[in-house]
C-alpha cells in the first residue's frame, strides 16, 4: 500500500478527547518544515527570485549587488511564507467547511449529540490541522534565529511566535480548537495577499504589489476587523456562557473563559494597531499614485543579515 492509499485509509472523522500526549508527533512536523523549505529554497525559490528580479538581463546575474542579494533573500522568505499560509488556509478550510460550526458559531460549543464545551471530542482531521500549525511555529522560533533575515522587530516576532505556540497548545487541550481553526483560517487568508504583495514589490512588479496590498487591506477589514470581533468574539464572550455547565465545571470553566477571551481580545487590539499602520501606508500609496511603499508592518529592517 502506497503513502497516498495509507492516508486515504485513515478515518479522519474519528473523534477522541484532546490531550497533551497528542503533541508527541509535534517534533515530526517541526522537522518537516525546514526540510521542505530547504528543498524549495534551493530548487524553486532561488531560481524564481533571480528570474523575476533580474528579468531579461540575465547577463547581470554574475554581478550581484548587495541590494539585489537582499531582495533575493527576502523574496525567498516571502515565497516560503506564502506557500505555508496558502497550504494552511487550504487545510483549515478543508477541515472546517462542512462542519456545522463553520456557518453557525453556536456549534463551537455544542454537538455532536449531547456534547457541550469543554467536554467535546476532537476529530482527527482537526488534530492534524493543529499539529501542522504548531509544528510550523515551533520551527519558526528556530528559523527566526538561524535562518530569517534579522529585522528590527526581531524581539516582537519572537514573542509573537512563542505566544502563538502557547495559545495553540492551550486552546487545543482546553477544547477551543473549533474556534481556533476558524481564527487560523481568518488570519492565513490575509497573510497570503501580504506575501504575494511583498514578492511583487521585491521583483519590481508595482501594479501587482499594489493590487495585492488592496486585497490584503480589504481582507483584513472584512475578516479581522468585522467578522472576528462581531462573530468570533461575540460567540466566545456570550454564546459559550449559555452552554457551559457551571455546576460541572465551577472552576476550570471560568478560568478557560477569561484566559482565552483575554488573549483573543489582545489579538483584536493588535489587529487595530496594525490597521492604523496599514491605513497610513494606504494613504501614502494614494499620494504616490499607486506606488507601494515599504511594508511598515513587518519589513522594516535593521539589516543585521543572516545568510541562507
UniProtKB/Swiss-Prot annotation:
Q: Which GO terms describe its cellular component?
A: endoplasmic reticulum; endoplasmic reticulum membrane
This chain belongs to which protein, by name?
A: Ceramide synthase 1 LOH3
What Pfam families does UniProt report for this protein, alphabetically?
TRAM_LAG1_CLN8
GO molecular function of the protein, one example? sphingosine N-acyltransferase activity
What are the TLC domain coordinates in residue numbering?
A: 73-287
Q: Where in the cell is it found?
A: Endoplasmic reticulum membrane
Q: Provide the tissue specificity.
A: Expressed ubiquitously at low levels. Not observed in pollen.
Q: Where are the transmembrane segments?
A: 25-45, 82-102, 128-148, 154-174, 213-233, 258-278
Provide the membrane topology annotation.
Multi-pass membrane protein
Q: Part of which pathway?
A: Sphingolipid metabolism
Give the EC number(s) listed in the UniProt record: 2.3.1.-
Q: Which residues does the record list as Phosphoserine (modified residue)?
A: 298, 300
Q: Which BP terms does GO give this entry?
A: ceramide biosynthetic process; endomembrane system organization; regulation of auxin polar transport; sphingolipid metabolic process; very long-chain fatty acid biosynthetic process
Q: Which UniProt keywords apply?
A: Endoplasmic reticulum, Lipid biosynthesis, Lipid metabolism, Membrane, Phosphoprotein, Transferase, Transmembrane, Transmembrane helix
Q: What happens when the gene is disrupted?
A: No visible impact on ceramide and glucosylceramide species with C(14) to C(28) fatty acids. The double mutant loh1 loh3 is embryonically lethal. Rare viable loh1 loh3 seedlings have a complete absence of very-long-chain fatty acid (VLCFA) in sphingolipids and exhibit strong dwarf phenotype and altered lateral root outgrowth associated with disrupted early endosomes and an impaired polar auxin transport due to abnormal localization of auxin transporters in the plasma membrane; these phenotypes are in part restored by external auxin (NAA).
Q: Which reaction does it catalyse?
A: (4R)-hydroxysphinganine + a fatty acyl-CoA = an N-acyl-(4R)-4-hydroxysphinganine + CoA + H(+); a sphingoid base + tetracosanoyl-CoA = an N-tetracosanoyl-sphingoid base + CoA + H(+); (4R)-hydroxysphinganine + hexadecanoyl-CoA = N-hexadecanoyl-(4R)-hydroxysphinganine + CoA + H(+); (4R)-hydroxysphinganine + octadecanoyl-CoA = N-octadecanoyl-(4R)-hydroxysphinganine + CoA + H(+)
Question: Is this entry keyworded DNA repair?
Answer: no
According to its UniProt entry, the function of this protein is described as: Essential for plant growth, promotes cell division in root meristems. Catalyzes the biosynthesis of ceramide sphingolipids with C(16) to C(28) fatty acids, structural membrane lipids involved in membrane trafficking (e.g. early endosomes) and cell polarity (e.g. polar auxin transport related proteins); active on a broad substrate spectrum, both regarding chain lengths of fatty acids and the sphingoid base, such as long-chain base (LCB) phytosphingosine (t18:0). Mediates resistance to sphinganine-analog mycotoxins (SAMs, e.g. fumonisin B(1)) by restoring the sphingolipid biosynthesis.
* Presence of keyword Membrane: yes
Amino acid at each position: 500500500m502506497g503513502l497516498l492509499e495509507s492516508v486515504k485509509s485513515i478515518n479522519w472523522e474519528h473523534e477522541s478527547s484532546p490531550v497533551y500526549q497528542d503533541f508527541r508527533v509535534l517534533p515530526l512536523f517541526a522537522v518537516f518544515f525546514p526540510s521542505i523549505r530547504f528543498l524549495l529554497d534551493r530548487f524553486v525559490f532561488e531560481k524564481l527570485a533571480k528570474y523575476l528580479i533580474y528579468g531579461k538581463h540575465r547577463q547581470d546575474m554574475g554581478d550581484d549587488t548587495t541590494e539585489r542579494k537582499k531582495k533575493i533573500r527576502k523574496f525567498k522568505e516571502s515565497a516560503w511564507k506564502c506557500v505555508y499560509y496558502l497550504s494552511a488556509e487550504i487545510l483549515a478550510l478543508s477541515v472546517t467547511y462542512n462542519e456545522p460550526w463553520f456557518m453557525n458559531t453556536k456549534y463551537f460549543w455544542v454537538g455532536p449529540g449531547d456534547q457541550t464545551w469543554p467536554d467535546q471530542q476532537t476529530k482527527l482531521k482537526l488534530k492534524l490541522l493543529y499539529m501542522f500549525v504548531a509544528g510550523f511555529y515551533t520551527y519558526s522560533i528556530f528559523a527566526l534565529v538561524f535562518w530569517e533575515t534579522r529585522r528590527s522587530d526581531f524581539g516582537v516576532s519572537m514573542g509573537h511566535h512563542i505566544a502563538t505556540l502557547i495559545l495553540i497548545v492551550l486552546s487545543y487541550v482546553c477544547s477551543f480548537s473549533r474556534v481556533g481553526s476558524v481564527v487560523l483560517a481568518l488570519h492565513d487568508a490575509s497573510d497570503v495577499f501580504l506575501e504575494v504583495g511583498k514578492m511583487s514589490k521585491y521583483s519590481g512588479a508595482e501594479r501587482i504589489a499594489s493590487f495585492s496590498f488592496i486585497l490584503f487591506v480589504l481582507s483584513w477589514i472584512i475578516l479581522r476587523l468585522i467578522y472576528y470581533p462581531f462573530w468570533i468574539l461575540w460567540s466566545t464572550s456570550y454564546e459559550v456562557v449559555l452552554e457551559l455547565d457551571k455546576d460541572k465545571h465551577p472552576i476550570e470553566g471560568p478560568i478557560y473563559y477569561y484566559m482565552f477571551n483575554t488573549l483573543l481580545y489582545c489579538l483584536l487590539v493588535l489587529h487595530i494597531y496594525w490597521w492604523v499602520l496599514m491605513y497610513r501606508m494606504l494613504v501614502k500609496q494614494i499620494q504616490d499614485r499607486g506606488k507601494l511603499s515599504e511594508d511598515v508592518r513587518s519589513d522594516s529592517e535593521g539589516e543585521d543579515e543572516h545568510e541562507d
